[in-house]
Amino acid sequence: VLDYSSLYPSSMISENLSHDTYVMEEKYDNLPGYEYKDITHDVYEWINPLIKSKGKRKVGQKTCRFVQFPDGRKGIIPQILQKLLKARKSTRKKIIYSTVKYSEEGEEKEFSGMYEEKNGLAIIKTVEGEIVDFPLENLISKKDTYSEFQKEVLDGLQLAYKITANSLYGQIGARTSQIYLKDIAASTTATGRNLLHLAKDKTLERFDGAEIVYGDSVMPDTPLLLKNKVN
């Protein structure tokens, strides 16, 4: 199974999709020193506006242009998403934090963070980002930093960050939302769809005999299920 991490939020970040980066007036187009990203999405209309159950039909395509700032700065929405995804990532790490005690030159020391063992060494990346390593024989004790209750709280918090990040796309695509802008929502799904096709093409190119049996572009998960053919 191949799965993009936070596909729609990541799409909005990578293409800088935001209300303040969407070029809607000609005077903001082709400015010197700026680059632009064009995204083409499908346009649909109701088959029968009075009977919504009949569904929609594709009537064309529209190309939207988004500015890419020369200093690498992101638009408002991508900045918010970056903060949410970063917070989620750091929160998820805390769930598996360990607290270790070890001896060094007769002195007992204690650190908490991401723990691993490699080549006879105990290695821990502390909360502050410092890398500490010591011989495994100097290890006195190791325990989970957080209790089971605290882990459940942290898990709920990381899930809240994830849902909030995903819901920003939903709000932009909802007519009742104050931040509704259909072209941004459509450009997001178009980017996500392109990434799924890219993953499919690269997989088939890399793994001889692989077959795509399912692809899901519904949030929050976007897996590609693969089957390897047996000759």
Task: Show where each model-derived region lies.
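Conserved acidic
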Residues: 1-231
